[in-house]
């Protein structure tokens, strides 16, 4: 008889439930496990070569019922009833449509009520569920970990492997507990928490880990907030981020199109309730954040870890002890055209972008509307508000949010990845500075020569009104 099973973390439980064939060997010499994949999400940018590989090998999609595609990265956010102007974008979208038709994959194209950013669509349809393994050819697949799933981005060759076999060979990841306790101050959001965490541990601090977010602040957070935090786990270098499912999770999923019903719902919840880290389980490492000490955050550099509280100033590289950090800061400040010691609140912006798979959900749009109500976007500032999906847009319209945005002088767009990345018409001009609710501030991310600062939706809205980096409290 075997001994009692050792206590396990949430990630280990989900992983163990999906091992088809265990890797051979021990410790460092152990081979990868073959992991079953419950849900495969597909979009137009990373899938064409994968479908070509299937075609050349004479294979088919093994589980089209577990594969869902949507158009998001390249799609325009205006005039969606007209042909896509950019030839490369048009070819990629048309190719996805042909591939999905040929291989029997469900697709939500532009204009479809269920179309939107892939990481918004999955949860809103109830496709994303606790205990699942979820993959997509996109870094921010970690978003779905907010439901207690192991969710990760994969490359094109791995996409082909999943399409053909519904499995992936993977080595187990290390585990990191990120505990956020304390009382979250007014005006501080999930986006501020994750930006503060990345600033604390660095963009490589989570490399090789699955991060499990825990603590009273996470437990009291909405699903939208949890998705924001898990979404940016990859920006700390992590493979995935997770939150244990609870009543908040169940209520979000209840009655969604693909959620279980009746006795199947009861059985699913009974299983989901087991998806918690055992009391005696040991993480490979642990990190703590005191929420009470947090404040609105803004990045100043060219990676998500180069951030400071809004009340702070641009840091001085000369005061940095680490040579690598100092050189990176000097390079970033040169690109961003910023001087050390400049108060963040004194930095003017040319554009404000609200949207993306990080902050394009209805809760985010409500926050923005609350700030914009009764105000106008500052002269010389261009503000784009892009819902994460057609469903989000419809709900925002029903709640009167679109009217608030337009009255304030913002552009209220159709769904898509939009200005998060320069793969569609929504781009910055060289030298333009943008406050963005997206997830990456790399050089040229929003367009060649564009300068991106990552902020929360609330800070984005206040910044649009004042024209310089601001919090809602600054408008009073």
From Swiss-Prot:
Heterodimer of LeuC and LeuD. It catalyses: (2R,3S)-3-isopropylmalate = (2S)-2-isopropylmalate. Keywords: 4Fe-4S, Amino-acid biosynthesis, Branched-chain amino acid biosynthesis, Iron, Iron-sulfur, Leucine biosynthesis, Lyase, Metal-binding. Catalyzes the isomerization between 2-isopropylmalate and 3-isopropylmalate, via the formation of 2-isopropylmaleate. Binds 1 [4Fe-4S] cluster per subunit. [4Fe-4S] cluster binds at residues 357, 417, 420. The keyword Metal-binding applies. This is 3-isopropylmalate dehydratase large subunit. One of its GO terms (molecular function) is 4 iron, 4 sulfur cluster binding. The keyword 4Fe-4S applies. Its EC number is 4.2.1.33. GO terms for biological process: L-leucine biosynthetic process. InterPro entries: 3-IsopropMal_deHydase_lsu, Acnase/IPM_dHydase_lsu_aba_1/3, Acoase/IPM_deHydtase_lsu_aba, Aconitase_4Fe-4S_BS, Aconitase_4Fe-4S_dom, IPM_dehydratase_rel_enz, IPMI_cat. It comes from Mycobacterium leprae (strain TN). It comes from the Bacteria. Its cofactor is [4Fe-4S] cluster. Pathway: Amino-acid biosynthesis; L-leucine biosynthesis; L-leucine from 3-methyl-2-oxobutanoate: step 2/4. Belongs to the aconitase/IPM isomerase family. LeuC type 1 subfamily.
């Amino acid at each position: 008889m075997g001994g009692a099973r050792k206590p396990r973390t949430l990630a280990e439980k989900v992983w163990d439930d999906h091992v088809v064939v265990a890797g051979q060997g021990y410790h460092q010499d152990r081979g990868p496990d073959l992991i079953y994949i419950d849900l495969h999400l597909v979009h137009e940018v990373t899938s064409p070569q994968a479908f070509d590989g299937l075609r050349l090998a004479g294979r088919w999609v093994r589980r089209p019922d577990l594969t869902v595609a949507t158009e998001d990265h390249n799609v325009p956010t205006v005039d969606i009833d007209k042909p896509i102007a950019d030839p490369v974008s048009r070819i990629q979208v048309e190719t996805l449509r042909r591939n999905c038709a040929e291989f029997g994959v469900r697709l939500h194209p532009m204009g479809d009520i269920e179309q939107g950013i892939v990481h918004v669509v999955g949860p809103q349809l109830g496709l994303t569920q606790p205990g699942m393994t979820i993959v997509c050819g996109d870094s921010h697949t970690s978003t779905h970990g907010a439901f207690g799933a192991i969710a990760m981005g994969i490359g094109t060759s791995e996409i082909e492997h999943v399409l053909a076999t519904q499995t992936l060979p993977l080595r187990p990841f290390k585990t990191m507990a990120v505990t956020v306790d304390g009382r979250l101050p007014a005006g501080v959001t999930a986006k501020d928490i994750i930006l503060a965490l990345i600033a604390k541990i660095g963009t490589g601090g989570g490399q090789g880990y699955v991060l499990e977010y825990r603590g009273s602040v996470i437990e009291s957070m909405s699903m939208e907030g949890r998705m924001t935090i898990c979404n940016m786990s990859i920006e700390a270098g992590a493979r995935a981020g997770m939150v244990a499912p609870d009543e908040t999770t169940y209520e979000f999923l209840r009655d969604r199109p693909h959620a279980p019903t009746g006795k199947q719902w009861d059985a699913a919840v009974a299983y989901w309730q087991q998806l918690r880290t055992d009391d005696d389980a040991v993480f490979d490492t642990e990190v703590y954040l005191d929420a009470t000490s947090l404040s609105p955050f803004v990045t100043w550099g060219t990676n998500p870890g180069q951030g400071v509280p809004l009340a702070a100033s641009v840091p001085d590289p000369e005061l940095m002890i680490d040579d690598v950090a100092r050189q990176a800061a000097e390079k970033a400040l040169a690109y961003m055209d910023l001087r050390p010691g400049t108060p963040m609140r004194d930095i003017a912006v040319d554009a404000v972008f609200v949207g993306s798979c990080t902050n394009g959900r209805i809760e985010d749009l409500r926050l923005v509307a609350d700030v914009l109500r009764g105000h106008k976007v500052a002269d010389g500032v261009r503000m784009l508000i892009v819902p994460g999906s057609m469903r989000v847009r419809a709900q925002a319209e029903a709640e009167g949010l679109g009217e608030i945005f337009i009255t304030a002088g913002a552009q209220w767009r159709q769904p898509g990845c939009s200005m998060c990345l320069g793969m569609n018409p929504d781009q910055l001009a060289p030298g333009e500075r943008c406050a963005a609710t997206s997830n990456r501030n790399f050089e040229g991310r929003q367009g060649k020569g564009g300068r991106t600062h990552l902020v929360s939706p609330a800070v984005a809205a206040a910044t649009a009104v004042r024209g310089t980096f601001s919090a809602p409290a600054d408008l009073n």
